[in-house]
């Protein structure tokens, strides 16, 4: 491609509304332009990257035995009502009506559509397993679109759905898709981790996220420094402290703590470490037959954070997790929020494993302006349960039993689920088994954020000059930068020759034939992130050489004119 025949819309300045590096560089490199909040037009360079990622995903899906289909973006509301998700989804589900006032949705995902399709096309176990996928635009009306294509309202996604006669078959395909995802992200040159994850609104049982490690990531992941264990912070298990709980030695004492509310304030006032304090949070339980909700006390160590996903999965706790308001706190504990404690609390008490290991600890006295010191489980709190309630912290022992946990930020680029029969049962998708009996199909679903991958790759691969693309997904593999070619016929001829040879070898090459200063050309090629560059000048041609430059390492070397094409083909594996 010649730049004179190409739309190379680079910007010198960073747009003020671009918050993270990938958004800034995608705008500056002329990859995308904003159309509306969370909606972007893809310019040629951006689309070239998007298509390369899409092709890698498609190849790995085909290798895994999945079959490509295409389904409508607009979906009948009745399918969502049938599955039960019409009421589960909030404003992020874009609902619309046609001219006949029939309700539809803009699809954020396609579980309902694919289940409806398969229930009418598949009726025998002989047609299973079946794995169907598509690569298609989705729409979610995000409350706060941000970070460019990282969290847009419109996005390109690969979604696959598998159907099975039994759980064993589902697990087999799930593992095959897990391997396909790893292969795809490895081919893209990404540093990623598959991690255990929560199923969220999609539902089902087993689930893994694929996280690209990046400081700008919205997710926090925990992984062992020794083994392959990795989990989203929501799912990472916090083990109980080793050994027996220390024996009680202090007497229970009530102390005045006026105008002291937070853990840090209590620690400073009483001159104790936050880890020696038990903090108590009150949440609501599930509604009983009369619509009443009990108030439940969750007790954690003062230096630990509540994991709300773990908490709302506890039996009897309202889902979604709902914290008690001031009025409910007053009624249940008889005090303000800053003075709640487990001693004397009349309701159900659930202590985190680490909190349950405390002895002689500080806690609220259930009297505004007072705390207790020397509190102890069993002696002072007779009835309580113990559960894993907290987020893990760096240095915790890994749940796998090997090594300690490290915490890193990640960008979720893929998510796979063992759905089980959540959708197939609700939508009556069944087949006849070998014995002629009707059985509900087991399902899996597998998503990849194709457009998000573009941004995630940039977050991992950039420097002060611009993007540093992995070769497999770069918009161009080689840039030809001729110095003053419009004033030097032999520079122009040599550039034309390299361009023809590289194109004939199947290399994606960008020939910068603009009438621009060399500094502008170099800056644009570095901003765009082309992995390899040939710089041609009269001085080098006098000596029979050109300059080769590697974008990732910054390496420069003079190479004989007769050898440069072979060198590039070798580096690109041609």
Curated annotation (Swiss-Prot):
It comes from the Bacteria. Keywords: Aminoacyl-tRNA synthetase, ATP-binding, Cytoplasm, Ligase, Nucleotide-binding, Protein biosynthesis. This is Proline--tRNA ligase. Consists of three domains: the N-terminal catalytic domain, the editing domain and the C-terminal anticodon-binding domain. Its EC number is 6.1.1.15. It catalyses: tRNA(Pro) + L-proline + ATP = L-prolyl-tRNA(Pro) + AMP + diphosphate. InterPro entries: aa-tRNA-synt_IIb, aa-tRNA-synth_II, aa-tRNA-synth_II/BPL/LPL, Anticodon-bd, Anticodon-bd_dom_sf, Pro-tRNA-ligase_IIa, Pro-tRNA-synth_IIa_bac-type, Pro-tRNA-Synthase_IIa_type1. Belongs to the class-II aminoacyl-tRNA synthetase family. ProS type 1 subfamily.
């Amino acid at each position: 491609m010649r730049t004179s025949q190409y739309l190379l819309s680079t910007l010198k300045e960073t747009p003020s509304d671009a918050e993270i590096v990938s958004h800034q560089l995608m705008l500056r490199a002329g990859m995308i332009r904003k159309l509306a909040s969370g909606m972007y037009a893809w310019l040629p360079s951006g689309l070239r990257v998007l298509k390369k990622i899409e092709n890698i995903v498609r190849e790995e899906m085909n290798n895994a035995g999945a079959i490509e289909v295409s389904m409508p973006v607009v979906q009948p509301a009745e399918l969502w009502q049938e599955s039960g998700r019409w009421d589960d989804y909030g404003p992020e589900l874009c609902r619309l009506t046609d001219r006949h006032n029939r309700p539809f949705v803009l699809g954020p995902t396609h579980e309902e559509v694919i289940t409806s399709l398969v229930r009418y096309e598949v009726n025998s176990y002989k047609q299973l397993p079946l794995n169907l996928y598509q690569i298609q635009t989705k729409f979610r009306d995000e409350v706060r679109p941000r970070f460019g294509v990282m969290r847009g309202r419109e996005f390109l996604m690969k979604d696959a759905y598998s159907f099975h006669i039994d759980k064993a078959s589902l697990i087999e395909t799930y593992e095959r898709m897990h391997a396909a995802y790893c292969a795809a992200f490895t081919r893209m040159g990404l540093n990623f981790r598959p991690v255990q994850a929560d199923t969220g609104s999609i539902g089902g049982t087993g689930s893994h996220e694929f996280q690209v490690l990046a400081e700008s990531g919205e997710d926090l992941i925990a992984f062992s420094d020794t083994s392959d264990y990795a989990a989203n912070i929501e799912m990472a298990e916090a083990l109980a402290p080793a050994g027996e709980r220390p024996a009680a030695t202090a007497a229970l004492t009530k102390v005045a703590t006026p105008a002291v509310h937070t853990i840090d304030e209590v620690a400073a006032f009483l001159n104790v470490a936050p880890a020696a304090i038990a903090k108590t949070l009150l949440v609501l339980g599930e509604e009983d037959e009369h619509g009443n909700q009990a108030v439940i006390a969750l007790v954690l160590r003062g230096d630990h954070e509540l994991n709300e996903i773990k908490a709302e999965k506890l039996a009897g706790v309202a889902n979604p997790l709902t914290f008690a308001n001031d009025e409910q706190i007053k009624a249940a504990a008889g005090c303000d929020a800053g003075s709640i404690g487990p001693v004397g609390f009349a309701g159900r008490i659930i202590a985190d494993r680490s909190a349950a290991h405390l002895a002689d600890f500080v806690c609220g006295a259930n009297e505004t302006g007072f705390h207790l010191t020397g509190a102890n489980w069993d002696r002072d709190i007779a009835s309580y349960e113990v559960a894993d309630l907290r987020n893990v912290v760096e240095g915790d022992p890994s749940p796998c039993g090997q090594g300690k946990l490290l915490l890193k930020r990640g960008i979720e680029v893929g998510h796979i689920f063992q759905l089980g029969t959540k959708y197939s049962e609700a939508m009556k998708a069944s087949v006849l088994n070998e014995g002629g009996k009707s059985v509900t199909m087991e399902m899996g679903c597998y998503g990849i954020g194709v457009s998000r991958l573009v941004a995630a790759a940039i977050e991992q691969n950039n420097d002060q000059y611009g993007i540093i693309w992995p070769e497999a997904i770069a918009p161009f593999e080689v840039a030809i930068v001729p110095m003053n070619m419009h004033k030097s016929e032999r520079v122009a001829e040599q550039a034309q020759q390299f361009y023809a040879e590289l194109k004939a070898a199947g290399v994606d090459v960008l020939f910068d034939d603009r009438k621009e200063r060399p500094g502008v050309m170099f800056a644009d090629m570095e901003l765009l992130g082309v992995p390899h560059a040939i710089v041609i000048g009269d001085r080098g041609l006098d000596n029979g050489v050109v300059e080769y430059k590697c974008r990732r390492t910054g390496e420069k070397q003079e190479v004989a004119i007769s050898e440069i094409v072979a060198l590039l083909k070798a580096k690109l594996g041609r």
